[in-house]
């Protein structure tokens, strides 16, 4: 079974945060202007924790009981799903948090698994999505093979 993600849109910063379901609702604080987080101690996040889950691309911190690093995406308002290209993904996710049925869980899981994580891992930066990682995770930084310019591309 794939990991279940809780998606939170911060309209003030235009950032979409992805966290596993069950994590603290506020997540971990992200100090600094670029959201950099100091490295975690090895005892805080076991390297094999959650390795059996099938959703590729999530760092080990996503499955930590101590709470995950937020996977933060800039330009979130421009991110669209391939299933419903006319819809804006953050709005769709926000409606789901309000209990409104606008996209099935299967569609959401397929989007994140096949369109985001797989393409970023195998193809590098996917320009079609117009989404860039901001700050990165202290356990895994999703980056294109070319020099990273995520901080200037948003």
Curated annotation (Swiss-Prot):
GO cellular component, one term: host cell nucleus
InterPro entries named among the record's database cross-references: Transactivation_prot_X (IPR000236)
Compartment annotation: Host cytoplasm; Host nucleus; Host mitochondrion
Keywords: Activation of host NF-kappa-B by virus, Activator, Apoptosis, Host cytoplasm, Host G2/M cell cycle arrest by virus, Host mitochondrion, Host nucleus, Host-virus interaction, Modulation of host cell cycle by virus, Transcription, Transcription regulation
Entry PTM: A fraction may be phosphorylated in insect cells and HepG2 cells, a human hepatoblastoma cell line. Phosphorylated in vitro by host protein kinase C or mitogen-activated protein kinase. N-acetylated in insect cells.
Region named Mitochondrial targeting sequence: 68-117
Presence of keyword Transcription: yes
Alphabetical list of Pfam families matching this protein: X
One GO process term, biological-process aspect: symbiont-mediated activation of host NF-kappaB cascade
Family the UniProt entry places it in: Belongs to the orthohepadnavirus protein X family.
SUBUNIT field: May form homodimer. May interact with host CEBPA, CFLAR, CREB1, DDB1, E4F1, HBXIP, HSPD1/HSP60, NFKBIA, POLR2E and SMAD4. Interacts with host SMC5-SMC6 complex and induces its degradation. Interacts with host TRPC4AP; leading to prevent ubiquitination of TRPC4AP. Interacts with host PLSCR1; this interaction promotes ubiquitination and degradation of HBx and impairs HBx-mediated cell proliferation.
Protein role: Multifunctional protein that plays a role in silencing host antiviral defenses and promoting viral transcription. Does not seem to be essential for HBV infection. May be directly involved in development of cirrhosis and liver cancer (hepatocellular carcinoma). Most of cytosolic activities involve modulation of cytosolic calcium. The effect on apoptosis is controversial depending on the cell types in which the studies have been conducted. May induce apoptosis by localizing in mitochondria and causing loss of mitochondrial membrane potential.
Name this polypeptide is given: Protein X
Organism: Hepatitis B virus genotype B1 (isolate Japan/Yamagata-2/1998)
Taxonomic lineage: Viruses, Riboviria, Pararnavirae, Artverviricota, Revtraviricetes
């Amino acid at each position: 079974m794939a990991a279940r993600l809780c998606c939170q849109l911060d309209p003030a910063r235009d950032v979409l945060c992805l966290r596993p379901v069950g994590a603290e609702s506020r997540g971990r604080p992200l100090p600094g202007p670029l959201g950099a987080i100091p490295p975690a101690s090895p005892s805080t996040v076991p390297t094999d924790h959650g390795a059996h889950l099938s959703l590729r691309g999530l760092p080990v911190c996503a499955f930590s009981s101590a709470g995950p690093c937020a996977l933060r995406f800039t330009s979130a308002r421009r991110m669209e799903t391939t299933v419903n290209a006319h819809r804006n993904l953050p709005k769709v996710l926000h409606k789901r948090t309000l209990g409104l049925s606008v996209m099935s869980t299967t569609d959401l899981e397929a989007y994140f698994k096949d369109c985001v994580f797989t393409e970023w891992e195998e193809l590098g930066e996917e320009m079609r999505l117009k989404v860039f990682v901001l700050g990165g995770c202290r356990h895994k930084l999703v980056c294109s093979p070319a020099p990273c310019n995520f901080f200037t591309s948003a």
